[in-house]
Amino acid sequence: SRRQRQMCIRDSRITDAKASKGETVLKKVLESDEGARRLGEVALVPNSSPISNSGLLFYNTLFDENAASHIALGQCYSKCFKGEKNLSASEISERGGNSSMIHIDWMIGSGEIDIDGFGKNGEIVPIFRKGEWVD
């Protein structure tokens, strides 16, 4: 059976979290520091990606996470800011990034996942349907 997780995010902060297994651990992780309650990474990967279709397990998170959509709680990657490499925590924050002592990835992708965003006027905008990008 799949483990179920739910997070309520308001004003870019996780305000509530539930898990069918490991909820106590999840809540302790969220209490690590203020940045632990914010997303540090969101990666949308279609279920049909070559790595996903390979069926291989590399036993290395940096490779395996690319087989599925995933999110990370905590620290963002400062190298993702255009033209920047070694930013301080305050510089990361000034650019809208998140600082934390943790960075915990978890895979959320599958051929069943639907992902929606919200437009400027609050309308729901489909992004993924059944694990694939919406055209």
Show the residue positions of the predicted features:
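Single conserved hydrophobic/aromatic residue that forms the stacking wall/gate
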Residues: S1-C8
